């Protein structure tokens, strides 16, 4: 059977000291909790907290005024300048577009006026040429009608002359053959002319 060996006296002293330290730490923490809980809620630390809060707020305000706010102001100013530039450019483009539209409308009106004038001139020229051609055609037809009437009258007179001669010869021959009369050709022509005049009067 193994015999137990007793621990040395020094080891016993160290273990006793460690236990005392642990007990002191626990007691101190317990006292701290009992004193006020969280440190930031301890009224004894309020002055220090307020001081550092003021310092921190001042630093933040300084940094904002020197760094952040100027940058924001620069951004806003640049944006305002860009908006103003865009508005100016839009106004210039609108004015240019209005000028182009006005020029286009003016040229369109001029083109319409020119086209209307050309059409009117062409219509007048066509009417004048048509009137002239109709006049020339009417004159030509009248001249042809007069020439035809002259030819008809000439043919009628020639036919009447031939009829008078033939009728006179026929009358002389008939009188000599039927009645045994010897008629003078001049007398026969006079009788035929008188008969033709009576026929004309009856026809008229």
From Swiss-Prot:
Key words, A-Z: ATP synthesis, Cell inner membrane, Cell membrane, CF(0), Hydrogen ion transport, Ion transport, Membrane, Transmembrane, Transmembrane helix, Transport
Keyword Transport: yes
Spans traversing the lipid bilayer: 50-70
GO terms under cellular component: plasma membrane; proton-transporting ATP synthase complex
GO molecular function: proton-transporting ATP synthase activity, rotational mechanism; proton-transporting ATPase activity, rotational mechanism
Main location, first listed in the record: membrane
Compartments (UniProt record): Cell inner membrane
Membrane topology category: Single-pass membrane protein
InterPro entries, sorted: ATP_synth_b/b'su_bac/chlpt (IPR002146), ATP_synthase_B_chain (IPR050059)
Similarity section: Belongs to the ATPase B chain family.
PANTHER family: ATP SYNTHASE SUBUNIT B, ATP SYNTHASE SUBUNIT B', CHLOROPLASTIC
Role, per record: F(1)F(0) ATP synthase produces ATP from ADP in the presence of a proton or sodium gradient. F-type ATPases consist of two structural domains, F(1) containing the extramembraneous catalytic core and F(0) containing the membrane proton channel, linked together by a central stalk and a peripheral stalk. During catalysis, ATP synthesis in the catalytic domain of F(1) is coupled via a rotary mechanism of the central stalk subunits to proton translocation. Component of the F(0) channel, it forms part of the peripheral stalk, linking F(1) to F(0). The b'-subunit is a diverged and duplicated form of b found in plants and photosynthetic bacteria.
Known partners and oligomeric status: F-type ATPases have 2 components, F(1) - the catalytic core - and F(0) - the membrane proton channel. F(1) has five subunits: alpha(3), beta(3), gamma(1), delta(1), epsilon(1). F(0) has three main subunits: a(1), b(2) and c(10-14). The alpha and beta chains form an alternating ring which encloses part of the gamma chain. F(1) is attached to F(0) by a central stalk formed by the gamma and epsilon chains, while a peripheral stalk is formed by the delta and b chains.
Name listed for the protein in its UniProt record: ATP synthase subunit b 2
Provenance organism: Rhodospirillum centenum (strain ATCC 51521 / SW)
């Amino acid at each position: 059977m193994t015999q137990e060996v007793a621990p040395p006296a020094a080891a016993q002293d160290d273990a006793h000291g460690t236990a005392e330290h642990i007990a002191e730490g626990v007691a101190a923490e317990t006292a701290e909790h009992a004193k006020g809980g969280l440190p930031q809620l301890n009224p004894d630390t309020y002055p220090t907290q307020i001081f550092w809060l003021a310092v921190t707020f001042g630093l933040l305000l300084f940094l904002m005024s020197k760094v952040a706010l100027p940058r924001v102001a620069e951004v806003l100013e640049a944006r305002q300048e860009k908006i103003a530039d865009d508005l100016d450019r839009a106004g210039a483009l609108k004015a240019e577009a209005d000028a182009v539209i006005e020029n286009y409308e003016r040229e369109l009106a001029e083109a319409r006026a020119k086209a209307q004038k050309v059409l009117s001139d062409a219509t007048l020229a066509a009417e004048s040429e048509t009137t002239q051609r109709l006049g020339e055609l009417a004159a030509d037809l009248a001249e042809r009608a007069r020439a035809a009437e002259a030819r008809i009258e000439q043919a009628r007179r020639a036919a009447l002359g031939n009829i008078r001669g033939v009728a006179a010869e026929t009358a002389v021959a008939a009188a000599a053959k039927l009645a045994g009369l010897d008629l003078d050709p001049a007398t026969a022509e006079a009788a035929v002319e008188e008969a033709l005049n009576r026929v004309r009067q009856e026809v008229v």
